[in-house]
């Protein structure tokens, strides 16, 4: 970052896009350059990912949503068990920000994997590049959903351009990293 004349700020995508928190007072061009630097870093990380999206209104209550999320995570683990078993430990980074997500993750992982094979870590983005990568991936997938529903924001348009540009420059690249 320093070589590019950019501040060394941990990535937190929503404040970056909206100019809040550590990015307050920073011009849009510098924030775009930071986004691009983070995105370049992401593309060079040896990671695979999968995202899920849910409309809370599609579920009669939180318990139904937790059950569905747990099922989806368990199926993802079982579908990729051979790959996951190559590792001594599966590290789960999450900041416990949303009870429903925390409960679903713990229930699914504890059901699908041996407890001695799992390590839970606080996924505070400022402490881990991996958490920053996850934040960026989730933001990009959410942006794709907004484009699909034609509810993208002016901020989305400013940072990513039209859907075709977003798809070519961001979405296709992160989807090559799907597990």
Feature names for model-found ranges:
Residues 1-179:
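Phosphate-ester processing/binding pockets and catalytic centers
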